[in-house]
Regions:
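N-terminal auxiliary segments of SAM/dcSAM-dependent transferases
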Residues: 2-59
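Class I SAM-dependent methyltransferase Rossmann-like catalytic core
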Residues: 60-81
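Conserved alpha-helix/loop element of class I SAM-dependent methyltransferases that forms part
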Residues: 76-92
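Conserved SAM/SAH-binding beta-strand->alpha-helix loop
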Residues: 122-126
Length: 133
């Protein structure tokens, strides 16, 4: 089984075209365990397999416990009617989930619609860390 950093590195090596530099908006390419733009801005894959694009930390009120409860609600069908509506439009599509939290909604959608490689962004490190589990 691959380590998280190895999974993250493999993803950026095959899907770097999904990303643009948040600083200068240039295209990015994989360079070892990082995404690098033409201007030299570098974003390293963390040990948890994630990328951190913000230029400073943002304090949020969202903690691990809140994201765990959110995951339970989604996994147990709270948004199933919405997932059912989205599924026909998402088949084999790339999805960008902005504000993905711990990633359970995108994961549920992928299980129903077989998505192309997709990406979730969130400002909460706790949510992203859970998403990478």
């Amino acid at each position: 089984m691959l380590k998280k950093i190895e999974r993250g590195t493999m993803f950026i090596q095959t899907q770097s075209d999904l990303f643009r530099c948040p600083t200068c908006h240039q295209m990015m390419h994989a360079q070892e365990k990082a995404l690098v733009c033409l201007e030299g801005h570098r974003f390293d894959v963390s040990k948890k397999g994630t990328l951190y694009f913000l230029n400073h930390q943002i304090k949020t009120d969202y903690d691990r416990e809140m994201f765990e409860h959110r995951r339970k609600l989604i996994v147990h069908g709270m948004y199933q009617p919405l997932l059912d509506l989205l599924q026909p439009f998402c088949q084999n599509q790339r999805i960008l989930d902005v504000g993905c939290g711990e990633g359970s909604f995108l994961q549920q959608l992928n299980e129903q619609a077989t998505l192309s490689p997709s990406v979730g962004f969130d400002i909460s490190k706790e949510g992203i860390y859970l998403a990478s589990d």
